[in-house]
Amino acid sequence: MNPDRRADILDAAATLILERGYTLTSVDDVIRGAGLSGKSQFYHYFPSKEALGYEVLDRQFAWFENHGLTVLRTPGVPPLERLNEFIDALVAIHRSRECRTGCPFGNLAGELSQAHEGFRSRIEVVFERWATQLQALFWEARMELVQDADAARLARFVVATLEGAILVSRVKRDPESLEEIAADLKRFIGMHVRGRMPAVVSRAGAAIQQ
């Protein structure tokens, strides 16, 4: 089994699913996108379209966890500043795409959560693992936060707000709406800081704007 060919199939499927959605992406589309000779070659690597879709989702979250979420764990940087940098980086990614693709996890959730239990349960885990990392960050920042700040609820709120903001900006094809909601999210978090409100724009955000 050729690992490069397998990766080609996953890459083609990920691109097509992001552009069209899972339902409108056929095995034939993936075969053409990956440059395969036919269905026998596809089924040599994946037993079904469903199995391929699961692996695409798993691989996308692995990348997000190992690259996108690493800023939340940057040593030597205060936790709330790390959160601001993460938000700024997420906004920058979607601005670079003109807010046309959306989030692969949010897209699949909207498309399949009512129709496909296998995908629904996997996407639920994706959001839970993302929120868990944010919860750890808020727990680390607990001495900066007001006494009644709930790390778990703040983490879930951040995930829900960012996913909603990405969806709205995709519908409007307007990066400014994403930036505005991200700034409002930072202000909301700032309301939970003892005696001060952190800057809306972090070091990473200032660098992005330059």
Regions found by a protein language model. Name each.
Residues 55, 69-101, 147-158, 205:
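Hydrophobic alpha-helical connector segments
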Residues 106, 148-168, 184-188:
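Hydrophobic alpha-helical segments that form the core
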Residues 82, 97-121:
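Amphipathic alpha-helical segments used for helix-helix packing
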Residues 8, 16-51, 55:
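Helix-turn-helix
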Residues 9-17, 90, 162:
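Short hydrophobic clusters on alpha-helical segments that form packing/core surfaces
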Residues 62-65, 69, 81-85, 116-142, ...:
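Amphipathic alpha-helical packing segments from all-alpha helical-bundle domains
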Residues 5-14, 30, 56-60, 64, ...:
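Generic hydrophobic, amphipathic alpha-helix propensity
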Residues 93-96, 159-176, 188-198:
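Amphipathic C-terminal alpha-helical segment
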